[in-house]
């Protein structure tokens, strides 16, 4: 077998592979010899079929098997022998001419194919001893825990029907039909909708006009949709809602006690507070971790400058760009609304994609050298978390992970990345700094603005290697404002 490099330009490589017809024929004859005793052909005793006849009957099919095996197995072996790692699966090209293909399968012509790929750049790891980061630490007060428990209690609050007029804080159950210019609009109708007056769930002015209504009353209220309302066909327009009040209910008292905990399936009020405190700690911990990680990535980005494989950058960029456009479509906005142009946005996201890929390669190299591995238990837990997000679709999701190799990689990559960050935190200089809740949140908002209003895409581009998937924990840029999340058709129209 001859392996000839025909292109070496930057990270791009092209390899021509030639396997002489004689070698292919020898391999075919070996296969025929192995199976001759098992083949049954009418008119011949087992094992007595002449080699020439076997070759005539089965030669081409065996040669086709050999060709498939070679193009499946040899690229990996060739790259390994060259000491190279491809950024993506190598592209394989071979003749498409029917006559030439027939000659190859008949061992009358050498078998040739071409590998085209990009190599992962060699990365010489640098010392991380000079990296210094600040880990913000926040003390959670009892008052904050109580405040959050009260919010939980509000959600579990009971209501009791009353005969009087609705007041602020009362819950109103109603049917309604929304109209613009006298015509009912899509999503503007609901039956049995419940709304707590003063909750701010519906658009401005809607809830205020429910104050004073009674059960059984019919009323038409008039509101104006905000100018920046996500649904462009409603934004800034006056609308009427014909309402039939079904019930008015007064709120019960909100108390933090064992009875409340019992309603929530928790053994006691103290245990409820423990759970809430744990949730707050987790939320602040995630924010602190995110900011800590950003500091590490920023400094690694300054330390490493090298050419990145275009194929990986394109895949990452396409994923970001797709999400950005989805966000714009959902919000009904344009790039001009975000004080930019499509051209400038493309440049920014291309730069972000390059940074992500570069840092992904660096993190992958650091992790490999440090012996970081993702265990089977960690993978199973991550997949289980995915299953919990889609109840009723467990079977389809499991089948997806089994049938799509890239799906497992997309689960493994973020776990691998976080474990590399954990490793780095043991190697770098970390200083703890106590901050208040306001400082923690205010700084994060400031950083978000400084980073051109970045927001994480919901899905990453499917990467072809773990190095690329290990990508980056930072967030991809997105529009400043998103459309309000859609709830029920009724809520959506009146929010």
From Swiss-Prot:
InterPro entries xref list: PPIase_dom_sf, PPIase_FKBP_dom, Trig_fac, Trigger_fac_C, Trigger_fac_C_sf, Trigger_fac_ribosome-bd_bac, Trigger_fac_ribosome-bd_sf, Trigger_fact/SurA_dom_sf
Residue segments, region Disordered: 441-495
Top-rank EC class of the record's enzyme: isomerase
Keyword line: Cell cycle, Cell division, Chaperone, Cytoplasm, Isomerase, Rotamase
This enzyme's EC code(s): 5.2.1.8
PPIase FKBP-type domain mapped to chain residues: 169-254
Keyword Isomerase among record annotations: yes
Any one Gene Ontology molecular-function term assigned to this protein's record: ribosome binding
Major location category of this protein: cytoplasm
GO annotation, biological process: 'de novo' cotranslational protein folding; cell division; chaperone-mediated protein folding; protein transport; protein unfolding
Protein location: Cytoplasm
GO CC annotation: cytoplasm
S-S bonds: none
Catalysis: reaction(s): [protein]-peptidylproline (omega=180) = [protein]-peptidylproline (omega=0)
Family per similarity comment: Belongs to the FKBP-type PPIase family. Tig subfamily.
Free-text comment on this protein's domains from its UniProt entry: Consists of 3 domains; the N-terminus binds the ribosome, the middle domain has PPIase activity, while the C-terminus has intrinsic chaperone activity on its own.
Role description: Involved in protein export. Acts as a chaperone by maintaining the newly synthesized protein in an open conformation. Functions as a peptidyl-prolyl cis-trans isomerase.
NCBIfam families assigned to the protein according to its UniProt record, in alphabetical order: tig
HAMAP family xrefs: Trigger_factor_Tig
Name of the protein: Trigger factor
Gene: tig
């Amino acid at each position: 077998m001859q392996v000839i490099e025909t292109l070496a330009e930057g990270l791009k490589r092209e390899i021509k592979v030639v396997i002489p017809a004689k070698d292919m024929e020898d391999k075919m004859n070996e296969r025929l010899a192995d199976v001759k005793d098992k083949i049954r052909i009418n008119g011949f005793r087992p094992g007595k079929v002449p080699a020439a006849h076997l070759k005539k009957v089965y030669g081409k099919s065996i040669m086709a098997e050999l060709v498939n095996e070679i193009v499946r197995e040899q690229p990996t072996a060739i790259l390994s022998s060259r000491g190279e790692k491809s950024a993506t699966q190598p592209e394989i090209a071979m003749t498409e001419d029917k006559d030439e293909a027939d000659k190859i399968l008949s061992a009358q012509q050498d078998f040739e194919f071409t590998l085209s790929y990009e190599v992962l750049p060699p990365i010489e790891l640098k010392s991380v001893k000079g990296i210094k980061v600040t880990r913000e630490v926040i003390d959670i007060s009892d008052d904050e825990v109580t405040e959050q428990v009260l919010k939980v209690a509000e959600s579990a609050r009971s209501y009791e029907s009353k005969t009087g007029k609705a007041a602020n804080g009362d819950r109103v159950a109603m049917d309604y039909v929304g109209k613009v210019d006298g015509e009912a609009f899509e999503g503007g109708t609901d039956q049995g909708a419940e709304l707590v007056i003063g909750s701010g769930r519906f658009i401005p002015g809607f809830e205020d006009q429910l104050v004073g209504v009674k059960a059984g009353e019919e009323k038409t209220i008039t509101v104006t949709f905000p100018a920046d309302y996500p649904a462009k066909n409603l934004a800034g327009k006056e609308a009427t809602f014909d309402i039939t009040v079904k019930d008015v209910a007064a709120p019960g008292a909100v108390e933090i006690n064992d009875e409340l905990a019992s309603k929530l399936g928790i053994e006691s009020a103290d245990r409820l507070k423990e759970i809430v405190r744990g949730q707050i700690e987790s939320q602040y911990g995630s924010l602190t971790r995110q900011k800590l990680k950003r500091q590490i990535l920023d400094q690694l980005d300054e330390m490493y400058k090298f050419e990145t494989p275009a194929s990986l950058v394109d895949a990452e960029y396409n994923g970001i760009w797709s999400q950005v456009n989805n966000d714009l479509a959902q919000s009904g906005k344009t790039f001009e609304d975000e004080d930019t142009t499509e051209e400038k946005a493309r440049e920014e996201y291309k730069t972000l994609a390059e940074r992500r890929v570069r840092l992904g390669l660096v993190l992958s190299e650091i992790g490999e050298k440090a012996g970081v591995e993702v265990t089977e238990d960690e993978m199973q837990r991550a997949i289980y978390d995915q299953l919990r997000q889609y109840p009723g679709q467990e079977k389809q999701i499991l089948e997806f992970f089994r049938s799509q190799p890239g799906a497992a990689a997309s689960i493994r990559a973020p776990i691998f990345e976080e474990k590399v960050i954990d490793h780095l935190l043991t190697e770098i200089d970390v200083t703890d700094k106590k901050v208040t809740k306001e400082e923690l949140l205010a700084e994060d908002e400031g950083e978000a603005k400084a980073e051109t209003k970045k927001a994480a895409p919901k899905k990453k581009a499917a990467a072809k290697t773990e190095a690329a998937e290990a990508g980056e924990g930072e967030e991809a840029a997105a529009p400043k404002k998103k459309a309000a999340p859609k709830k029920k058709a009724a809520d959506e129209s009146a929010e």
